[in-house]
Design a protein with these regions (language model features):
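A short alpha->loop->secondary-structure connector
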Residues: 13-18, 38-50
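A short, active-site helix/loop in glycosyltransferases that binds the activated sugar's phosphate group
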Residues: 27-37
Length: 168
């Protein structure tokens, strides 16, 4: 279930928002504007699309900025991104979805060490979590794999697993 599905709650049937900023990469912007019910949110001005570009910092206000960066994932309808969130004195890395760390052209340990907090994909704990399912069809790094990669790190308390599913 794509993360974008929750946007429908901004529409007139639920919240009835007005010009709520929605930050989106190019392919997601096109998808939202071209497909209902999301296109209705744009038409009725429930949401206002704000464009994002890979590795381009966006200031949300005087104190907080975000930088989206592409990560390898299924990308059926749009790009998949993580975010670096920066405040006046702290930074956070947010990667809720990624296929496998080995497919990414970055060093996970280095990224985690460069930030104060890391919120990373914890969708599945291990290979056998969904008996009878081909886990390659729903790719995510297993928590045990991520813990193994991060084993050499000294400060592990800055890592928090998110995007948990109903089985873990």
């Amino acid at each position: 279930i794509g993360h974008y599905s929750g946007l429908i709650h901004f529409g007139r049937e639920v919240m009835g928002n007005k010009n709520t900023p929605v930050y989106a990469m190019p392919k997601m912007t096109k998808f939202i504007k071209s497909n209902g019910p999301w296109s209705q949110l744009v038409k009725l001005k429930n949401i206002k699309i704000k464009s994002l570009k890979n590795d381009k910092k966006v200031k949300l206000n005087k104190r907080i900025s975000i930088t989206p960066f592409l990560v390898p994932h299924r990308d059926e309808f749009s790009e998949t991104v993580g975010f670096k969130v920066e405040g006046p004195s702290k930074s956070l890395i947010y990667i809720p979805d990624i296929d496998k760390w080995q497919k990414w052209d970055n060093d996970l340990i280095k990224i985690v060490e460069e930030n104060d907090y890391s919120l990373i994909d914890g969708t599945f704990a291990e290979q056998d979590e969904l008996p009878g399912r081909d886990m390659s069809k729903i790719p995510h790094p297993f928590i045990v794999e991520t813990m193994d990669i991060l084993k050499p790190m000294k400060e592990k308390s800055k890592v928090h697993f998110i995007h948990l599913n109903h089985t873990n």
